[in-house]
Amino acid sequence: MKAYVFPGQGAQFTGMVKDLYENSKLAKELFEKANEILGFRITDIMFEGTAEELKETKVTQPAVFLHSVILAKTLEDFKPEMVAGHSLGEFSALVANGALSFEDGLKLVSQRALAMQKACEIKPSTMAAVLGLADNIVEEVCASIDGVVVAANYNCPGQLVISGEISAVER
């Protein structure tokens, strides 16, 4: 069985799919369309920006979405039997499956990212992946810390994401 599984936020890195942009007419057209839709040159940040610029939610989410969707569109001969996505990757899966257009998917992801960015500016917070500990241990540690910190995403056994106030998460 062939499948695409698309990642969520956190999979970004500077320079991702730059080679595809430079060598694929379809990829370049889609990236340029994305620059227009977003109202800024996300390609400049994706290909040449700093890790800090790329880490901003309002940039990260559209960048990861574009990486996933454009890669899938350039591999259309692959024809997966199923698609799935983790968190943000669910939007990429919807576009890859034809349930959403590229344009609508990008607009939704951009609005989602802006809303999340705004929420972070109103109430500064953060997330951190905790690897190699049992869920109940992480939950107990979170409960013992002053401030707000909770187990937020149970990714898989041994990988849990915590979120909350910056000072509490950093403890």
Where are these regions (language model features)?
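A broad detector of short, well-ordered amphipathic alpha-helices
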Residues: 25, 32-33, 66, 70, ...
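Alpha/beta catalytic cores of group-transfer enzymes, especially the acyltransferase/condensing modules
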Residues: 9-11, 38, 97-171
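Glycine-rich nucleophile elbow surrounding the catalytic serine of serine-hydrolase chemistry
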Residues: 86-95, 99-100
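A general structural motif at alpha-helix termini
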Residues: 49-50, 87, 109-112
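Structural motif
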Residues: 83-86, 152
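Alpha-helical scaffold segments in soluble metabolic enzymes
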Residues: 15, 19, 33, 70, ...
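Helix-rich "cap/lid" substructures immediately adjacent to catalytic or cofactor-binding pockets
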Residues: 2-84, 162
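Residues that mark the start of a beta-strand
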Residues: 1-2, 126
